[in-house]
Amino acid sequence: LSLEIVTAIKKRKSVNLPVSYYFSIFDKIEDGFKPKDLNEMLNTLENAGVDFFHPFAIHAMNKCFENKDPLCQWTAKFSNKPLIINGNIKSPQLLEEAAALGCADWFALDQSIFEKSQWYQYLKRKLNQ
């Protein structure tokens, strides 16, 4: 279904929007989903026209598969498309770690940060540490 949606969006000449694919694989790993399956999925979606990927994890650096790399790093290995990561990003250290691994082009802030009434000041303090 995802492939059909991406293909339909890209076929419309009147719509020139980038397409992001937001996904998680953690529920599939128990069913035998392997790195080769992720590679095939990403390649198929890239060929359909996905412009960037948004791998989802409860925590941005959650490990997966046998060598314990995070999902964002696996995605970066298999795709040259830009990546958005999210998931409990509450410190500059996490941003630096993801950037050092080369597995994040953009970062999405966790919704819990917006529960803080002074979220902007909180974020500013964190970034200035």
Residue spans of the language-model regions?
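Flavin-dependent oxidoreductase catalytic cores
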Residues: L1-Q129
